[in-house]
Amino acid sequence: LFRDILRRRLERGPVLKRLREEFFKAATEILDPDEFLLALRRDIEKLNNYVLIISPFLNKTTVEKFCNLREVDKALREGKKIVVVTRPARVPEVEDPGEHALCTRILRDHGIKVIEKEKFHFKAVIIDDSIIYVGSINPLQIVTVRYIPADYMLRFVSEALVDEITERFIPEYQDWLKGSA
């Protein structure tokens, strides 16, 4: 009996592996900083309910640019929720507390909910429980004017992956989405 089960599994193994590989090729993108920003804009444009941006560090230029995107403006005017999770504006959490505090104020002034969380380095964007970006790019800090850093984001279209990551690594996720800016 065990040998039969093992034999059937080995026969199916390569087929399942190929299916998994094809699925992930279709549902996954590897994005450099410029590609990430373009993909994020497209996703915000199609936003149904919310976008959660987890960016430990903030840059004034990047935050202002984000707040002034037509896609962000449209989403907010339509009552969709944009939530940013970042570190508190104090040393040792951030290098420049003054700039960081200014960034959080700019976000709030635009109607974006800001949540401060200490001591985290995770970077991600979650859209409508179905799209997740994870990687090394701080979404609201990255600046690509002088050079493109060797950072990346992986974009997955997978409700199951969003569930898995939020349950295992972001237990506060549902609380962050409650309430308004």
Identify the role of each PLM range.
Residues 14-34, 49-60:
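Acidic/glycine-enriched edge-of-secondary-structure segments
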Residues 123-126:
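Short beta-strand scaffold segments in enzyme catalytic cores
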Residues 112-117:
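General small-molecule cofactor/ligand-binding pocket signal
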Residues 1-17, 132-181:
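Signature of lipid phosphatidyltransferase scaffolds
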Residues 36, 40-109:
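Primarily the HKD phosphodiesterase
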Residues 120:
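Conserved catalytic or regulatory cores that recognize and/or transform ribose-phosphate-containing ligands
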